[in-house]
Amino acid sequence: MGLEEKLPSGVLLTTVEQIVGFVRKTSMWPATFGLACCAIEMMAAGGPRFDIARFGMERFSATPRQADLMIVAGRVSQKMAPVLRTIYDQMAEPKWVIAMGVCASSGGMFNNYAIVQGVDHIVPVDIYLPGCPPRPEMLLDAILKLHDKVQNTKLGVHREREIEELEQRRLRALPLIQQTEEATR
């Protein structure tokens, strides 16, 4: 006497969104965007000690067209910002971004005119990972938190609306240099 015998054939006890969420979270391919010392810790997470493959990330993708997760590890210069945006735009939907380290999250410990003060001014960020540099264990924890977010992601029109809201929020955010200029006026 199992559940299958009690229910008529063809009955599914879950939603399509839950199935799709499970499949997406267990088969992510990250595109690496390592720019500084955080990239060393990201590479360590791919090694046998931390084994990122057990979470469905069998390989890091060298091409953005085959990736659905971008891990920005390190500081982004003003000249590198358009390249980052181009790579993000080339990624297939749905796509997620982890800002790994203080430099990617907020520009680092120095307010430098040549450094973007947080990659969220360029691309919408889903998970911010603090640390200088964050340990591989922290990256794995951030990936697990992202898995929870992916599991509960809406599909179709609801996802498009969510992406549009994130993009509008990103466009409204001023870079730190412009915030400083406005404060001195």
Swiss-Prot record:
Keyword terms of this UniProt record: 4Fe-4S, Cell membrane, Iron, Iron-sulfur, Membrane, Metal-binding, NAD, Quinone, Translocase, Transport
Q: What is this protein called?
A: NADH-quinone oxidoreductase subunit B
InterPro entries from the entry?
NADH_UbQ_OxRdtase-like_20kDa (IPR006137), NADH_UQ_OxRdtase_20Kd_su (IPR006138)
Q: What does this protein do?
A: NDH-1 shuttles electrons from NADH, via FMN and iron-sulfur (Fe-S) centers, to quinones in the respiratory chain. The immediate electron acceptor for the enzyme in this species is believed to be a menaquinone. Couples the redox reaction to proton translocation (for every two electrons transferred, four hydrogen ions are translocated across the cytoplasmic membrane), and thus conserves the redox energy in a proton gradient.
Similarity-based family: Belongs to the complex I 20 kDa subunit family.
Catalytic activity from the UniProt record? a quinone + NADH + 5 H(+)(in) = a quinol + NAD(+) + 4 H(+)(out)
SUPFAM superfamilies linked: HydA/Nqo6-like
Q: Which residues form a coiled coil?
A: none
Q: Which gene encodes it?
A: nuoB
Mind giving the lineage of the organism this protein is from? Bacteria, Bacillati, Actinomycetota, Actinomycetes, Streptosporangiales
Cofactor binding remark: Binds 1 [4Fe-4S] cluster.
